[in-house]
């Protein structure tokens, strides 16, 4: 079975690599040290510090594994390879809900780079899926779990 690929920009991949390095070189050794200290307290059957450290170790190792998979199967997307006015990963898109005055600006990223607070939406999110491939002037219906709404794409530009 073919592995899933993770479309992302080069910047997103570099961010994941830094995060992985931090986990391996800083967090993992910290957790190992906490386990070592907790073991020194004696009886492990009633040692809450030991259990907490082991839980944290499992969490950190899970994060490491997830990041390694995303990096290994990263598919670097070159936004220059698509039309200048076409919505794609690595592009900034300005939209306006039909019948509303307010404009919204989103940066389309791979799932690894999503950050709603920074206006970065994943290509796998409802809004990302519904905008990918559309061009300036197009309308799109955004399907969300709570309903749908129509938007007009006002501007598409390469993300700086």
UniProtKB/Swiss-Prot annotation:
Name assigned to this protein: Transcription elongation factor GreA
GO molecular function: DNA binding; RNA polymerase binding
Record lineage: Bacteria, Bacillati, Bacillota, Bacilli, Lactobacillales
Coiled coil: 1-72
InterPro entries: GreA/GreB_C_sf, TF_GreA/GreB_CS, Tscrpt_elong_fac_GreA, Tscrpt_elong_fac_GreA/B, Tscrpt_elong_fac_GreA/B_C, Tscrpt_elong_fac_GreA/B_fam, Tscrpt_elong_fac_GreA/B_N, Tscrpt_elong_fac_GreA/B_N_sf
Keyword tags: Coiled coil, DNA-binding, Transcription, Transcription regulation
GO BP annotations, alphabetical order: DNA-templated transcription elongation; regulation of DNA-templated transcription elongation
Superkingdom: Bacteria
HAMAP family: GreA_GreB (MF_00105)
Protein task: Necessary for efficient RNA polymerase transcription elongation past template-encoded arresting sites. The arresting sites in DNA have the property of trapping a certain fraction of elongating RNA polymerases that pass through, resulting in locked ternary complexes. Cleavage of the nascent transcript by cleavage factors such as GreA or GreB allows the resumption of elongation from the new 3'terminus. GreA releases sequences of 2 to 3 nucleotides.
Family under the similarity heading: Belongs to the GreA/GreB family.
């Amino acid at each position: 079975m073919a592995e899933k690929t993770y479309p992302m920009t080069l910047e997103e991949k570099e961010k994941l690599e830094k995060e992985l390095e931090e986990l391996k070189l800083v967090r993992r050794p910290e957790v190992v040290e906490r386990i070592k200290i907790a073991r020194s307290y004696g009886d492990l059957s009633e040692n809450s510090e030991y259990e907490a450290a082991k839980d944290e170790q499992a969490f950190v190792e899970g994060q490491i594994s997830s990041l390694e998979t995303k990096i290994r199967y990263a598919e670097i997307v070159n936004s220059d390879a698509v039309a200048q006015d076409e919505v794609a990963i690595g592009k900034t898109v300005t939209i306006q809900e039909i019948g509303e005055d307010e404009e919204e600006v989103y940066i389309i990223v791979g799932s690894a780079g999503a950050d709603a607070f920074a206006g970065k939406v994943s290509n796998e999110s409802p809004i990302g899926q519904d905008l990918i491939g559309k061009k300036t002037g197009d309308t799109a219906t955004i399907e969300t779990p709570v309903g749908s709404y129509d938007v007009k794409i006002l501007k598409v530009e390469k993300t700086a």
